[in-house]
Amino acid sequence: MLSLLPDLQGKKLLDLGCGTGGHLQLYLERNAERVVGTDLSVKMLEQAEQELQKCGQFSGRFSLYQLPMEKLSELPESDFDVITSSFAFHYIEDFPTLLAMIANKLKSNGTLVFSQEHPITTCHKEGERWEKNEKKQQVAYRLNHYRDEGLRERNWFQQPFKTYHRTTATIINDLIAAGFQIEQMAEPMLAEQPQWHDEFKDLRHRPPLLFIKARKVINLTK
């Protein structure tokens, strides 16, 4: 995602779902003037503050807020040059409303850069995800329920959670409707990361993530 960012010199950035602040630190290292992070987890925000405070030169240049993305309008800061989010938007039910709030927090010509689970992953509802050969090796990824947008009930090591599926077309059209112009998209494949082949060999057949860079070009009514 960092490769999609514009020059950060002197810029003000907001990272939605900042976690422990890894991206915030990278932005400051790239000479951003000020960074703001939001997250749901108090523990992650506490760790983010500890890590950022370790770097004395960052003092006074960052703020952290416990705030869900769905309540972004309540953030007391605005006029950001760049807003980012990593691997989080597929947890949002009302994507158009989130984009409207993001647009309101951005300056004119401000940039939004985000990643999320790829729609060919979020679409899955039931059955096996993989077609396997006689040796039980994964040879093809099954695509199903792609047009059936909405809630997906999922489990990760027996921990239930919810995500929301949107087609690529819906994601793009929602961005356009919110006043954004698409500047770049990326679908990194494992083939481009040979050092991960053994550990993540199941990702050779599909892009796991979708990355989008968009610029605010229309000021809609707030």
Descriptions of predicted regions:
Residues 96-111:
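A short glycine-rich, Lys/Arg-flanked "PGG" loop and its adjoining helix->strand segment in the class I
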Residues 1-11, 26:
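Conserved alpha-helix/loop element of class I SAM-dependent methyltransferases that forms part
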Residues 120-124, 155-169:
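Acceptor-substrate binding/catalytic loop of class I
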Residues 113-149:
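Conserved class I S-adenosyl-L-methionine
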Residues 14-16, 20-72:
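Class I SAM-dependent methyltransferase SAM/SAH-binding core
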Residues 162-185:
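Short alpha-helix
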Residues 74-83:
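A short acidic, Gly/Pro-enriched loop at the edge of an enzyme's catalytic core
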Residues 87-90:
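Short catalytic micro-motifs in class I SAM-dependent methyltransferases
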